[in-house]
From Swiss-Prot:
One of its GO terms (biological process) is sexual reproduction. Belongs to the profilin family. This is Profilin-1. Binds to actin and affects the structure of the cytoskeleton. At high concentrations, profilin prevents the polymerization of actin, whereas it enhances it at low concentrations. By binding to PIP2, it inhibits the formation of IP3 and DG. PROSITE patterns: PROFILIN. Occurs in many kinds of cells as a complex with monomeric actin in a 1:1 ratio. Its main location: cytoplasm. It comes from Dictyostelium discoideum (Social amoeba). The lineage of its organism: Eukaryota, Amoebozoa, Evosea, Eumycetozoa, Dictyostelia.
Length: 126
């Protein structure tokens, strides 16, 4: 399965409004859904958050021009919120999965979608 298929089928196909997969080391965009534009500085910032996840509480997470307030930050998962929408970021060995949800999706459901893909990629060496 290609990285784009993971985004299309496992993230947006599962109900998230937007999704992307980035390189864990450099934050480069490997695949993304339409409607999300993660700039190089944003990708760098996302990758850097996983080096010091507690910073998400002070700095938030900037994704596609939207700043999300940090509500969870650990070396494996970062969650953010902005009003009724939010983001779930999950780091595997080689990738960072980005899931964006809108007000039609419960935060717990969004987290389950992204964490499940993260577990699958980790189990398969990514």
């Amino acid at each position: 399965m290609s990285w784009q298929q993971y985004v299309d089928e496992q993230l947006t196909g599962a109900g998230l409004s937007q999704g992307a997969i980035l390189g864990a080391n450099d934050g480069g965009v490997w695949a993304k859904s339409s409607g999300i534009n993660i700039t190089k500085p944003e990708g760098d910032g996302i990758a850097a958050l996983f080096k010091n996840p507690a910073e998400v509480f002070a700095k938030g997470a900037l994704i596609g021009g939207v700043k999300y307030m940090g509500i969870k930050g650990d070396p494996q998962s970062i969650y953010g919120k902005k009003g009724a929408t939010g983001c779930v970021l999950v780091r595997t060995g080689q990738a960072i999965i980005v899931g964006i949800y809108d007000d039609k999706v419960q935060p717990g459901s969004a987290a389950l979608i992204v964490e499940k893909l993260g577990d699958y990629l980790r189990d398969n060496g990514y």
